[in-house]
């Protein structure tokens, strides 16, 4: 009987240790994913700002709070499997100092190719290079090998 209890305690200890390891890995994965999302967001904004600099436009400053919405929007598009614009962009910009807003959404195999496609599209290019814009919110999600991007511009 004592051997059975000792064995049960050892098994419970092993199970607890395994659970702790699995939970720690989940937390690490979440942190790594968040870190990767931030790097992708920063990279996409740098591509946009590089294009603006080549056309003597001011650098866009990132709105991190609005970027959470942009990320949510990108995730929705990836989940649904198609592109769509924010239904009411004005409501998302409420409370910000703005008079003009715009949005680019896209999906592509790389962020570089996606920025290139934006620059070849007249309405997207207009948003990227618009003088009145001074802020941007960026959301990037990778799903099934593709990058789903939402960039909200305002100024």
Predicted regions and their residues:
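A short alpha-helix/helix-coil micro-patch that ends at or immediately precedes a cysteine
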Residues: 30-78
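Disulfide-stabilized extracellular recognition modules
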Residues: 107-155
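Surface-exposed patches in mature extracellular/periplasmic domains of secreted proteins
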Residues: 54-68, 81-92, 125-141
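Short, surface-exposed glycine/acidic/tryptophan-bearing loops
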Residues: 67-115, 128
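A generic alpha-helix surface/boundary motif
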Residues: 46-50, 87, 99, 119
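Bacterial N-terminal signal peptides that target proteins for export
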Residues: 3-15
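Loop/turn elements at helix/coil->beta-strand transitions in domains of secreted/extracellular proteins
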Residues: 53-55, 100-101, 134, 146-148
């Amino acid at each position: 009987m004592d051997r059975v209890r000792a064995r049960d305690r050892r098994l419970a200890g092993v199970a607890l240790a395994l659970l702790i390891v699995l939970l720690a890995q989940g937390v690490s994965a979440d942190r790594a994913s968040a870190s990767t999302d931030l790097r992708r967001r920063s990279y996409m904004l740098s591509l946009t700002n590089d294009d603006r600099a080549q056309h003597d436009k001011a650098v866009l400053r990132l709105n991190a709070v609005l970027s959470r919405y942009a990320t949510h929007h990108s995730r929705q598009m990836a989940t649904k499997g198609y592109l769509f614009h924010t239904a009411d962009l004005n409501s998302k910009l409420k409370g910000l100092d703005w008079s003009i807003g715009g949005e680019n959404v896209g999906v592509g195999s790389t962020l570089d190719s996606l920025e290139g496609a934006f620059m070849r599209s007249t309405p997207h290019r207009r948003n990227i290079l618009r003088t009145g814009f001074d802020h941007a919110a960026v959301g990037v999600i990778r799903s099934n090998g593709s990058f789903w991007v939402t960039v909200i511009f305002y100024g």
